[in-house]
Amino acid sequence: MVLPLFRRAAIARTSSLLRARLFAPASEFHSRFSNGLYHLDDKISSSNGVRSASIDLITRMDDSSPKPILRFGVQNFSSTGPISQTVLAMPALSPTMSHGNVVKWMKKEGDKVEVGDVLCEIETDKATVEFESQEEGFLAKILVTEGSKDIPVNEPIAIMVEEEDDIKNVPATIEGGRDGKEETSAHQVMKPDESTQQKSSIQPDASDLPPHVVLEMPALSPTMNQGNIAKWWKKEGDKIEVGDVIGEIETDKATLEFESLEEGYLAKILIPEGSKDVAVGKPIALIVEDAESIEAIKSSSAGSSEVDTVKEVPDSVVDKPTERKAGFTKISPAAKLLILEHGLEASSIEASGPYGTLLKSDVVAAIASGKASKSSASTKKKQPSKETPSKSSSTSKPSVTQSDNNYEDFPNSQIRKIIAKRLLESKQKIPHLYLQSDVVLDPLLAFRKELQENHGVKVSVNDIVIKAVAVALRNVRQANAFWDAEKGDIVMCDSVDISIAVATEKGLMTPIIKNADQKSISAISLEVKELAQKARSGKLAPHEFQGGTFSISNLGMYPVDNFCAIINPPQAGILAVGRGNKVVEPVIGLDGIEKPSVVTKMNVTLSADHRIFDGQVGASFMSELRSNFEDVRRLLL
C-alpha cells in the first residue's frame, strides 16, 4: 500500500522566519536544515507500519550557544490496515508551555477540515490561542474532551482521516501516542491485570478491586504544587457524567471547580472535604464504571483504609514511649503548652477542633475528667506540689484559664501562604531602593470633576494614577524592565502592563491592565472594575493575573499618608500611593508675589529593584510621574 503524502507546516503563517514541510517516503531518515538564523531538526521514521514525523527542535543560531525556540507535538501516520490516519497532538504554542487546556472544540467529529481551519481553542500558560489544522481531511475522533485541563504537550488530542468513509474504522483510543511512554495525568484507569500500577503516596491493593479510575489532585495553575479540597459537590455513590463538577479546589490563586473527564460512579472519596495542602498528583477519589462495583470498593481492605493513610500526623509535642496512635493532626500552641506543663500524653487526648486540631479546651477537659494519661518522659519534670489528676480536677481548671492568654488559631488560605512565601523571598533576594515624592493633586482633581460634569464620565483618582504611571514607564523605558537572574541581565519589556493590588477575602490578588499606556482613562476605569469584581469572586483567568511589568498599591482610601510596598517578583518596581492631604504652601501668584495657598498633595513611594533602578533611573521616573500629575494633558499625548 502506498502511503499518502502527508505534509505539515512547521511554522504556520511565518514570512520572515522559516517554512518547512515534511515528507515520509523512506523508512527512516534524519535531516537538518538551517537558514543562518534558525535551525530545524526533524526526524521521520517508520516502525510496525506506523510512520511518525516530528519536528524536534527549532533553534536560534544568533549567539554562541543554540537556544531552543519552539518544540512541536507528534503526528503519527498509519499505513497499515484499511485506513490512513493522522494523530493530532497537543502543540507547544509558547516557548514555556508544557501543558495546555482544551477550552473549546470548534469542529465536531465527522466535520470536514481544510488547511487553516480552527480546530479548537487551547489555553496555554500565557493566553488562549486558536489551534489551526495543517492538514485537510475529516475529524474522525476527539480524544480529549472540551474543558480538559493540564494536557501535556505531545499528548494525542484528536484523530484525522483523509476519507469520510474511514471515520467508522478509527479506533476509540490510541496506544503509544506519546512514543509509547505512559504519562501520569489527573485521570488514570487502574485494572487488576495491569502489570504497572500508578505510584503515589497512596497505592491501593488493586488485586481485589474492580476496574476503576483514580482521580488525582490536578495542577490548576502553572505555579500550583498543592491545593485544598474546599468542597465535594458529589457524594459517594453518585452518578457522574463527563463535565460534571465533582468539587471545588482552592489553589494558590483562586478557588476553581474540578470537572470530571470520566463518566461512572463516585465510589470512594479518599481526601475529605476541608483537607489542606494536598500535593498535586495525590489520589483524591475513585470512580468505577457501574454501580455494582461501588460495594466492592467500599468493602475491600484497600478502599476502607485509604482515607486513614492520607492524613499526615506530625510528631507529638512530647515523647511517646508507646505505639498508641494520636487522635489529632495538629496541636494549637495553647494546647501544646498545657500538655508540657502537666506532663500529659498527647495521644491520649481526643481532638475536637477543625480538621482534627487538638485545642486548649480539649486538654482542659481531659485534665478535669482525669482521662489524660501521664507521659513517662515528663516524670522528672514534675513539681513536688503536683497532685494526682483525680485530686487536682477541681483546682487545675481555673488556674489554667487565669494563667493563659486567650487567642484563636486562624488557618491561612493557600493564596495567603503563597503571598507570604513570595514576599519573604522578595525582601531577602531583591535589593530594595526607596524613593519618595509629594505630588500636587489639584490639576488631577479638577480634570476629574470636568470629565464628570461636562462629559458624564466617572473615573476614580486611581484610574488616572494608573494612566499617569503607564505614561511615565513608556517615557522612561529603563524603568519598565525585570532582572534575569540566570543570565544576570536586564530585560526591557515592550509593553506596559500594570498590576493593580486588589484585596480579597482569601488574600491579595494582582489583576493586570495590559498595554495601559495605549488605553484611554475611561477604558482603564471599566477594565479595573471588571477585573476587581472577578478577583473578589475568585474567577480571574490565569492570563488576567500572571505577568505584569509594574505594580501599583493604592491605600489612599484609608487614613494612610505614606507607606513602602514590597516588590512583586519578577517585576522590578511597585508604587505605593497614599491619601491626599490639604497643606498650606507658598505659591507665586500672577502678580509675582509669593502668597500662602492651600493645595492638595499626595505622597507616592517607589520601591525599586536596585539592580535595575539606579538613582538616575528612579529619579527620572519620579520626575516624569510628577509632571503627569501637574499637567494632566500629558496623558493624552
Curated annotation (Swiss-Prot):
It comes from Arabidopsis thaliana (Mouse-ear cress). Keywords: Acyltransferase, Lipoyl, Mitochondrion, Repeat, Transferase, Transit peptide. InterPro entries: 2-oxoA_DH_lipoyl-BS, 2-oxoacid_DH_actylTfrase, Biotin_lipoyl, CAT-like_dom_sf, E2/Pdx1, E3-bd_dom_sf, PSBD, Single_hybrid_motif. Binds 2 lipoyl cofactors covalently. It comes from the Eukaryota. The keyword Acyltransferase applies. It is found in: Mitochondrion matrix. One of its GO terms (cellular component) is pyruvate dehydrogenase complex. Residues 176-196 have a biased composition (Basic and acidic residues). Residues 1-84 form a transit peptide. The pyruvate dehydrogenase complex catalyzes the overall conversion of pyruvate to acetyl-CoA and CO(2). It contains multiple copies of three enzymatic components: pyruvate dehydrogenase (E1), dihydrolipoamide acetyltransferase (E2) and lipoamide dehydrogenase (E3). Residues 85-161, 212-288 form the Lipoyl-binding domain. GO terms for molecular function: dihydrolipoyllysine-residue acetyltransferase activity. Belongs to the 2-oxoacid dehydrogenase family. Residues 330-367 form the Peripheral subunit-binding (PSBD) domain. Residues 390-403 have a biased composition (Low complexity). Residues 171-210, 374-408 are annotated as: Disordered. The modification N6-lipoyllysine is found at residues 126, 253. This is Dihydrolipoyllysine-residue acetyltransferase component 1 of pyruvate dehydrogenase complex, mitochondrial. Its EC number is 2.3.1.12. Signal peptide: none annotated. The active site is at residues 610, 614. PROSITE patterns: BIOTINYL_LIPOYL, LIPOYL, PSBD. It catalyses: N(6)-[(R)-dihydrolipoyl]-L-lysyl-[protein] + acetyl-CoA = N(6)-[(R)-S(8)-acetyldihydrolipoyl]-L-lysyl-[protein] + CoA. One of its GO terms (biological process) is pyruvate decarboxylation to acetyl-CoA. Its cofactor is (R)-lipoate.
